[in-house]
Amino acid sequence: MFLNHTITALSSGMASLVAPIPLLATVEAENSPIVMSGVLLSLVVIYIASKIGAEVALKFDFPPVLGELVAGVIIGISALHLIVFPGSGLSASDSGIMTVLQSINHLSPAALTSVFESQSEVISVLAELGVIILLFEIGLESDLKQLKQVGIQATVVACVGVAVPFAAGTAGLMIIFHTAAIPAIFAGAALTATSIGITSKVLSDLGQLNSKEGQIIVGAAVIDDVLGIIVLAVVASLAKTGEIDVVNVIYLIVSATIFLLGSILLGGIFDKTFSAVVIQLKTRGNIIIPAFIFAYFMAFLGNAIHLEAILGAFAAGLVLDESDARNDLDEMVKPIADLFVPIFFVTVGARADLGVLNPTVPDNRAGLLIAVFLIVVAILGKIVTGWVVFGQPGINRLAIGVGMIPRGEVGLVFAGIGSASGVLDKPLEVSIIIMVILTTFLAPPFLRIAFGDTVVPPATGELSSEKIV
């Protein structure tokens, strides 16, 4: 109601200046309740799909996030067309949500298109907010003390696990498939991430979380996440300019690194301030509101210095992870993430047009080859990391390499941002999503095979305090 009154008041105030504007504003004011209806109905569909998908995935012992992604594919452009977006090749009349609104409100074609675009924009903004909250949550779950203890072995594994897939993926796409530089770099960057959550769960199930291999894998995965976020911030910024300038690339890498490290170093000072503020506040939200003020401000700073909001959100999570209120904050963020993060994952799936990889269409075969190439590089590029471990005779190198394979949610962040920015064409976008799905599905059985007869009864899940060097 407030929005309606505001739009109407603005249109009345401008009437004496420009005649057509009040009419346009009046039309928009009339459509705003319908836009809200479209947003609400879209959220109903997204939440139902995400919950069903997550529950089915969990039933088969797969990460819920993959269920949310597949649910998005089903309700999106690839199947049911319930949630579609402008630029996908479908119009407002193809959207199931818009069909319902049309039948209720009898909209003209022009009004239907206007509502469709406005509703899609709102859902896209909510999805972007979801990924910011996701990276904030990942930052909160990343233990800086563990980062300091992982030692040189995990650091080397992480660096190689980022460099090899990135270089091989980017070079292969440009040389073999003649992909343009920036899309190739973006796809190569999507190969760098490792999902610590998936790997940790499998290691815990196998009783290998406290083993030397387990400590190296988990430590490397944590560092891998940090490096991956820096890479994402850099390549996403490159996508905005549309060109590769060496000076700009150096600036982005240096500024992203300084921003992240600077935030961590200043974290000790801010932790005390944050704790003092929390103690002084007596009303509801005394912990979560200051935390999100900090997270959103850091996200704003990330954007302001021409990086990415997600880098700022991730840095905020790392900083607050050291605060006295960490445990309370972890629990408070979860329900907020539960509301917004599924919107991101479902919309990533909804935007993915799997039809571009239909093998019966000759023009799609190049896209299929790209998907196969990315999957091979994604697997081999991580497996080689096991052979860079030194000074550890008898260590299971294959298990270390396989443990770095799953991409999980961070890989989907690459796909989502690449799609939203327009830097990825449909075949490349879908190839990245399929790569993420397959590597995440394949990693658990591969890891069980790699450990073979060395499996021991599940441990408590706590990491040993012994430093691997």
Report the location of each language-model feature.
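Transmembrane helical cores of multi-pass secondary ion antiporters/exchangers
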Residues: 2-469
